[in-house]
Amino acid sequence: MKTSLRTLSVALAAALVSPSVLAIEKIDFHGYMRAGVGVSSDGGLAEWQKTMVGRLGNESDTYGEIGLGAEVYKKEDVSFYLDSMVSMLSDGSNDSETTIGDDAQFGLRQLNLQIKGLIPGDKEAVIWGGKRYYQRHDLHIIDTKYWNISGSGAGIENYTVGPGAVSVAWVRGDANDVDTRITGDSDVNINYIDVRYAGFKPWAGSWTEVGIDYAMPNPTKQQKEYGGLYDADNAVMLTGEISQDMFGGYNKLVLQYANKGLAQNMISQGGGWYDMWHKTDEAKGYRVINTGLIPITDKFSFNHVLTWGSANDITEYTDKTNLISLVGRAQYQFTQYVRAIGEVGGFYQKDTYHNGSNYKQGGEKYTIALGLAEGPDFLSRPELRVFASYLNDSENGKPFEDGTSNDTWNFGVQVEAWW
């Protein structure tokens, strides 16, 4: 026994002083968090349609992402970088929140290897494999990503071609619990091919990116025999965007088209997930997004997101769905650390069905807040904010107070940070 322990100790010591460990000069620590406390007119904080009316004063969760990364090998132009990230989500209701009873949910979000310096002709191009957030395109004030093909995969990114760079990836994004009538075999494997070209500048101050995502459901033999929802077609999503420097900020225009199982993203504020839960053989959708961040003065800045989307036949019952959403957030910096924030958002969505009926959704949110953060940068974090919000369902959906009210208010304190 003593000999075994001595052998193990020697092995551990040798591992700790090995060249591969000593090569790690620093660990990169990065992440995101939001947390807070608040009340509404009906108990705890209400959260309603935040991707449509805005997130400020309209979030009720505690969420965090903790990432660790390190360059584990470096020789001349060749670099091997390992990255990892875990996430945690809870409702913030108790002191001790564990996985018991789903008080808290933990997830493995990223675990990948990124290699530079091995592609001839471009030492900055990256070969990668593993699980990662893949080039996500974010709309921060409504907490959604309009282009988001993330998951386990592999690819080559940022390979210089002409004035820009090409990225090609294969990413897995399965659909779960599609049809539980097939016992133990209701998850469908879906593979995406993602191709992007970014960096072409047609004029001074501009920047463009275009891409295509091709989703391929890959059912098992049993699922193919069963048919139905498992008999899903391959789908495509096209994205093109152009950004323009403007008054020290920017404005961006995004145009998107999607069909089949990807079409519903155009009216759901989604970023590329495949809908296996509805019949989508004839589905088509379009989306236009305009967003920008403009520092109007040294102390006053404004961020907006305007979304218009339209889709046909996204379910076997739905003829057409139209969506329009507009959210604006203004910020005024009183002192280096004190700011006033206001956010207003509204949306309207109409689903028209093949039987001639329709379903309407719509509403507004108004928020005022006092924030503490180093200014005047609009996105400077960490930030602590005290807020009050009013939320209203203008289409009589009664989403509040146990289905009895069309409106409610929130009051609370929230902190947000990324690093």
Swiss-Prot record:
GO biological process terms, semicolon-separated: monoatomic ion transport; polysaccharide transport
Primary location recorded for the protein, binned into one broad class: membrane
Catalytic function, reaction form: beta-maltose(in) = beta-maltose(out)
GO cellular component: cell outer membrane; pore complex
Induction note: By maltose.
Membrane topology recorded in Swiss-Prot or TrEMBL: Multi-pass membrane protein
Recorded family membership: Belongs to the porin LamB (TC 1.B.3) family.
Function: Involved in the transport of maltose and maltodextrins.
PANTHER family: CRYPTIC OUTER MEMBRANE PORIN BGLH-RELATED
Protein name, as recorded: Maltoporin 2
Species this chain originates from: Yersinia pestis
